[in-house]
Amino acid sequence: MPLGQRAGDKSESRYCGVEVLDFPAGEELPAVLSHSLSSSFDFLLAPLVDPDYRPTPGSVLPVAASDLVLGPAQWSSHIVGKINEWIDLDAEDEQLRLDSEITLKQEIAWASHLSLQACVLPPPKRSSCANYARVVNHILQGLTNLQLWLRIPLEKSEPMDEDHDGAKDNSDMSDTVDSWEWWNSFRLLCEHSSQLCVALDVLSTLPSMNSLGRWFGEPVRAAILQTNAFLTNARGYPCLSKRHQKLLTGFFNHSVQVIISGRSNHNVSQGGVLSGDENHTEDTAVRHALSPYLDYIAYIYQRMDPLPEQERFEINYRDFLQSPLQPLMDNLEAQTYETFEKDTVKYTQYQRAIAKALVDRVSDDDVSTTKTVLMVVGAGRGPLVRASLQAAEETGRKLKVYAVEKNPNAVITLHSLIKLEGWESLVTIISSDMRCWEAPEKADILVSELLGSFGDNELSPECLDGAQRFLKPDGISIPSSYTSFIEPITASKLHNDIKAHKDIAHFETAYVVKLHRIARLAPTQSVFTFDHPNPSPNASNQRYTKLKFEIPQETGSCLVHGFAGYFDAVLYKDVHLGIEPNTATPNMFSWFPIFFPLRKPIYVPSKTPIEVHFWRCCGATKVWYEWAVTAPSPSPIHNSNGRSYWVGL
């Protein structure tokens, strides 16, 4: 039974499982499953094979249960396989190593036969796990629907001794082992397989928040919450520390399922449940020993705020790679216009900026005698025309509007709007590319919405430089400036989605994407800034910058899959618009961030800065970006000469 109802959330994190610690021999598995389901758990993490089994010639695999004891849907929906923990593919003992390989392959084959969705692999037993990864990589190449979840403890622990005999090399005594490093080594050896995921063991102590944050960019499918991580409240019930609660909420928001594991450490009477937990009130006679822990997890889930309306609208776009618009080369479709026009926040900001500009342009004494000439370049279907006229009405200023639009289909709608609203005497429609049109008079105010996710990536500088000839020497441009920003991120899902194309071109393309399963590794830094009117209209719009990002020391090492890009625009004076995380305009959805991927992810050791170079290049027919990392290790220069991705003029 799901943990509860949270408006807008349909993710897998609503389901909670329980780990079966003892091998369910014979026909016990159906009873164990039935008991768990009746106690409101949704699935089992269960061993598939007797832990005492060692392969011998001619022996039959001692499985937990015949495939007939559960129906196909039960196996698929309610069982996650647990691979035997004695398996050690990097052991010095050759027989143990060979037995481990045979058994692992047999267990995975049995799980595939049962049509399980996932199996949990035991954690690496030492930091060097190359043979373990090699065997798993072989297995992954033969899988289709089965995912393998590598179990990793969520901790920074003392270094493991290679021989497990308690003796430690003195040279390593001062170091700590970051379990993220085990995962990173393993997934690199397995070539970033999209079917290799993580199951995190959540213990009683947690690393720093920055260190934890790395995992939100990784393919974490389950958080295995140990019962010894729970505290006891005043009523004797299990509860979690504030830090554990925050982590759990983060998991829920990232579609991570919780699995409760361990023995019950709380002697709670079977009669009561936590207040507000109406979904978990089954007959106490059959309740599971770990039900009090489930009740608490459900309580945490149910008290989360509903997903905001904007998040619900955007949920299907999460981590979905889209090509940026080419507004100069292509004419937008009606559906695209409609989506943008629903963003009332954006047009409210434009109206505020235009109103301030009108008041500055025309004093109260000149209101009755002065008419302001305003040009909307790239008028689309008219939302900026409407915002301009509303600003004029609000401020009591007279306005003459030129609406310039190159898309003949949008011009048809624009004519209908002007006629419907009775604006024929106020608005002149120009069906032309702004770069070709010769204006009959100069404008006091030039208004445009040519901004892309990276500010200048939809060629606003080129368009406005061409339209600047319409503007009076003391005229006002809205926007007056815009700046792009980037930050390094971990984004395993985006990397794997791009890798699936199996070519370089897709790794040299910038994508618009609603970022979700990512880890932000360092604060954003500014990249390029453009001002309008351009004080040097004949100057090139080419740009180059070099940035150095310092990752907080407590984060530890990390893997950079690329750079997230944003913009912030000054519309006029103190009215701004943007998506840069620190200053983002609330409740605006016209722009998702842009993502610049790296062909090969860059490993960044702890305390090591990242140095990145960005170029904005201009040619006769196109504009493109190039980017490269030079520290801590050099990457190729991506998209050299615009060979893979460009914006056409």
From Swiss-Prot:
Keyword Transferase carried by entry: yes
Where do the SAM-dependent MTase PRMT-type domain residues begin and end? 321-627
Q: Which UniProt keywords apply?
A: Cytoplasm, Methyltransferase, S-adenosyl-L-methionine, Transferase
- Where would one find coiled-coil regions in this protein? none
* InterPro entries cross-referenced by the UniProt entry: Arg_MeTrfase, Arg_MeTrfase_PRMT5, PRMT5, PRMT5_C, PRMT5_TIM, SAM-dependent_MTases_sf
Covalent S-S links between cysteines: none
Region of interest (Beta barrel), residue spans = 479-649
What does this protein do, in the record's words? Methylates arginine residues in proteins such as histone H4.
The similarity comment for this entry is: Belongs to the class I-like SAM-binding methyltransferase superfamily. Protein arginine N-methyltransferase family.
Q: What is this protein called?
A: Protein arginine N-methyltransferase 5
Q: Which organism is it from?
A: Oryza sativa subsp. indica (Rice)
Gene name on record?
A: PRMT5
